[in-house]
Structures are given as structure tokens and as C-alpha cells.
Amino acid sequence: ITASSVDELEWKCAEMKKLLLSQDMDVQPCSFCQEQAFLSSLPLVSLERSLFERSKRNVLTLGAASCYPFTSYEMCDDNGILLGVNKHNNSLIIVDIFDSRVYKNANIAILGTSGAGKSFSMQLMATRMRRKGIQVFIVAPLKGHEFHRACSNIGGEFIQISPASQNCINVMAIRKVDRSVDEMLDGPGVEKSLLAAKIQRLHIFFSLLIPDMNHEERQLLDDALIRTYARLGITHDNSTLDDPDHPGQYRTMPVLGDLYEVLKESPDTKRLANILNRLVNGSARTFNQQTNVSLDNKYTVLDISELTGDLLTVGMFVALDFVWDKAKENRTEEKAIFIDECWQLIGANSNRLAAEFVLEIFKIIRGYGG
């Protein structure tokens, strides 16, 4: 405080004391103590006793913490799974992605360079979720063998889909889904044609199999699909799905071979039939049979790494479609779908319809406990 006279200086000091006292701050004069104050500010761990007595105050721990110039970040959810150790402060990273109080949804994207450990991190999360009782599905389009040992050791189901495998998922099957939980929670819903929904997804399948299919061929394919199901007594009326000889079960579903026979009948769909012949009578005829695998196991791996070229994205879609039907059965149970190498379906050169299907799962799986 400076002034041009002693009286002015005393007045300014008095006003300053009033101002500080109004803000609950005590003021003590430290005349001729500049040297001691300077030495106390140096990192000498030395504080003048008289200055300490005048300047000391009691501070709550919360206030003292605010003076600490560092912040320690950590993720430690109450009921999560251990992912690793924070390399910055050595704290454990424990995450519960299903905790809606902390996270808006449970979706996770694992990104990294080649060899960074993306597949390992995914498998680590999957096995630890399984130990917590969460149902896990893994779709492995590449390096499926990496998941086999862990799957076997925890009693999981390893399903290999390839031309040389005996496992098969009938892409044309309309699968019976238990909707009792949905009806209990929401009441009876509006009945929708299951055949129409299935044909819509089959259009995605054939757009992956035949990328250059034009609009006319899509319409002809749509008519052929409806006629194929009609020959087995299945129409847009959902009651026609029930098997009269086996109550509570669906009818025997058509396979690709049935559609192939319908496509051969018209010269306009001859090209589609010729392309489909590979999956019916050719090297990939393993797709032309009824479904012989189950997804009831709590830890299921679908290995499609033996499929190459255009069949890889086709097989990936078939596996994902199968898993998605199973995941929608009971939305009160927690479940996780892991898609390794997801860029195969949503990358820049991928099929638009397939990418939209993956996006749909990504957006609404939260409503089904995933």
C-alpha cells in the first residue's frame, strides 16, 4: 500500500483491513519483514516463526486438496470386469459397461494398429463377462483359431462355418423367438409379418452375394422368395408358421436349394440361379441344409475364418443375423455381441445394406440388455 502522506497511508490501511475483514480474512501487520518473507518463499523448508504465527490458519482437507496441482484419473465401477492397470497411476481399470447410471449405453469400439492386441482385449472382455454370467456371442471372421482354446476351457460352444465344416446355419429359416418377456413387460404388441421381416434380411444376404444385382432382379428375387415359402405353406399370416403335426414348433423351413429350383423356372432369374448354384451344388453347398447348431450356450464363438473372398462377408452376415435373433429373445438378461474385424461389414467398400444392419444392431441392442 502506498500513499503520498502518512495520514493517507493510515486511512488506506484501515480501509483495506475493513474490506478483508468483511470477507472473513484476518490481517496482521508485518512491518520490516520483507527479508524473512522472501526467505520463507524459497524452497529451503524454513519458515520464520513470527510469520508463521501471524499467517497460519486451519484448512479442511477438501480445501487442501484443491491446492494440489495434480489430478489422478481412474475407472473403478462397482460391479465391473478388470481390464488392466492404468499406466499413469497404476490404478486398476474396472469397468461395468452395463451400468446405465454411468454410461448411456454399453457399446464399445476397440481401435488400434495391427498387432496392438485388439482381438486379445476383446477375448479378455468376453471371458470375464462370461464369468459374471453374461451371455457372450463372438463372430470371428479372421483368426478364429485364436478363440478356440479359451472357448473349450470354459465349456463354450465353438461353431465353425466353412465349406468343409459340418456346421450350418440355414439363412432362410424363420427362427422361433420367445417373446413372453416382451409381452409381460409391454403387453401384447402389434403383430407383424415375420415372413416380410425375413425376406427383408434375405435381400441384404443376396446383395452381398450378388453385388451387381439390378432393381429388376431384386423384384424378381422378391417374388421368388415369396413363392418358395408359399410352397411349404408359409405366408404373411404368422399362424401359417406353426407346424400342425408338432404343436409349439415351426414348420420345416426352405433351404437355398428350394429357392434355386424356383429361380431356375424363369429365364429372367437364370443368372441369379447360376450364381446361387455355388451354394447349392458347388463347393459351398454346406449352406444348403437345415440349421444344426445351437446358441443356448453362455459362451458361443462363430468361426467363419475359413470363408474367403466374397463368401467372407456373406458368412459374417449369416452368423450375425443368427446371433441377433437369439439376442432379442429376453431383454431382461445381459448379453454381449463381439464382432471382430467389423470393418468387413461397415468399411468404405462394404455393402450399404449390410452396414445399415450393423448400425441397427448398434443402436437398438441397448433395449435388449446388450
Task: Give the location of each predicted region.
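Conserved ASCE P-loop ATPase motor domains encompassing nucleic-acid-directed helicases/translocases
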Residues: I1-A37
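A generic structural motif
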Residues: I1-L9, T113-A116, S305-T308
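Short, hydrophobic/aromatic alpha-helical segments in well-folded domains
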Residues: K12-M16, A106-A109, S121-A126, E146, ...
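P-loop NTPase motor domains
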Residues: M25-D26, Q36-I93, K143-G144, A150-G156, ...
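Active-site-adjacent "gating/activation" loops or surface patches in catalytic cores
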Residues: P69-M125
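Short hydrophobic/aromatic beta-strand immediately N-terminal to the Walker A/P-loop
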Residues: N107-A109, F137, V301
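Post-Walker A helix-loop "phosphate-sensing" segment adjacent to the P-loop in P-loop NTPases
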Residues: T127-F137, I154-G156
